[in-house]
């Protein structure tokens, strides 16, 4: 198992399920849910929020150590979750944004150190948290020269920024870049180095022979990455548009639609499912993999 990829050392099973619930509920129209199931889901949300808060020794959301560690994966994803669920008050979200802005400004004030310890997807996470909490990632604090910090421009549109090309992190960079710009349907600026079409093409080009996706072409299909790719591609389902790219397996020019690639990817996910319905990653059942598969399914309706 790849230590650099699996996130078990950061996210507990309950925390991952919280992320699942938050994204799932906001991704799907409420009318498609059976009315008698909504109270169960809401109760689940509240239980997980209560567990996380109590485990941190806090009685209120986004306070204490959780807020003090704004800019870290654990705190940011929790803030993202409770903001998307509507559990955090406006005051709590504003307080978290203020602390997160301090963290972002510190990142830009120490770029050399930040580039060594952070990946571009970490900045995407911060941008998504800003959006969820009601902030503006295109104008979030100032850099040491007094210029507004534009997290969207610096991590997606402009590959000449200090964070470089989204692909420098491999497939993860493309996934989170696309998720970030679609979180609020950001418009591509004229002359953007990376466009939606380019990001989508890069993702499609990385489909493995069995239909799934992995970190590199020699890796087996990974449930988490396959599900993450499907989630990122979900806004483009049902379109006739074709994309042309060089497949990493064939080395040849290929043309496909998002739906055609997704059909193969979902088929591979089905093959990686255990008899009890959970998902297997490297022959191991994990809540993270199961949660990501459910998010992908929910995103595609």
Q: What are these model-derived regions, one by one?
A:
Residues 25-38:
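Sec-dependent signal peptide cleavage junction
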Residues 1-9:
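N-terminal secretory signal peptides that target proteins for export/translocation
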Residues 150-166:
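A conserved helix-loop-strand patch within extracytoplasmic ligand-binding domains
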Residues 15-27:
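Bacterial N-terminal signal peptides
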Residues 35-70, 89:
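N-terminal module-boundary/linker segments of secreted carbohydrate-active enzymes
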Residues 145, 149-150, 196-200, 262:
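Core helices of alpha-solenoid repeat scaffolds
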Residues 60-91, 113-139, 163-196, 208-264, ...:
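An alpha-helical repeat/solenoid feature that recognizes helix-turn-helix modules
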């Amino acid at each position: 198992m790849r230590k650099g990829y699996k996130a078990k050392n950061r996210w507990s099973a309950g925390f991952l399920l919280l992320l699942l619930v938050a994204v799932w509920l906001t991704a799907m129209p409420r009318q498609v849910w059976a009315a008698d199931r909504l109270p169960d889901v809401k109760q689940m949300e509240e239980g997980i929020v209560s567990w996380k808060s109590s485990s941190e020794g806090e009685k209120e959301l986004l306070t204490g150590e959780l807020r003090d560690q704004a800019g870290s994966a654990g705190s940011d994803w929790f803030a993202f979750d409770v903001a998307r669920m509507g559990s955090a008050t406006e005051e709590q979200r504003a307080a978290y944004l203020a602390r997160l802005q301090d963290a972002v400004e510190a990142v830009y004030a120490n770029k050399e150190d930040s580039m060594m310890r952070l990946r571009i997807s970490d900045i995407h996470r911060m941008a998504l948290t800003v959006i969820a909490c009601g902030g503006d990632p295109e104008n979030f604090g100032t850099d040491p020269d007094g210029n507004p910090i534009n997290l969207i421009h610096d991590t997606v549109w402009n590959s000449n920024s200090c964070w470089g090309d989204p692909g420098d992190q491999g497939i993860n960079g493309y996934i989170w870049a696309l998720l970030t710009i679609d979180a609020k349907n950001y418009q591509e600026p004229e002359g953007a180095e990376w466009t939606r079409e380019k990001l989508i093409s890069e993702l499609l080009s990385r489909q493995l022979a069995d239909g799934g996706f992995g970190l590199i072409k020699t890796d087996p299909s990974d449930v988490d990455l396959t599900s993450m790719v499907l989630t990122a591609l979900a806004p483009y389902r049902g379109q006739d548009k074709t994309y042309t790219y060089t497949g990493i397996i064939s080395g040849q020019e290929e043309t496909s639609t998002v739906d055609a690639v997704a059909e193969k990817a979902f088929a591979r996910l089905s093959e990686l499912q255990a008899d009890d319905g959970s998902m297997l990653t490297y022959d191991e059942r994990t809540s993270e993999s199961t949660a990501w598969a459910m998010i992908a399914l929910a995103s595609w309706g």
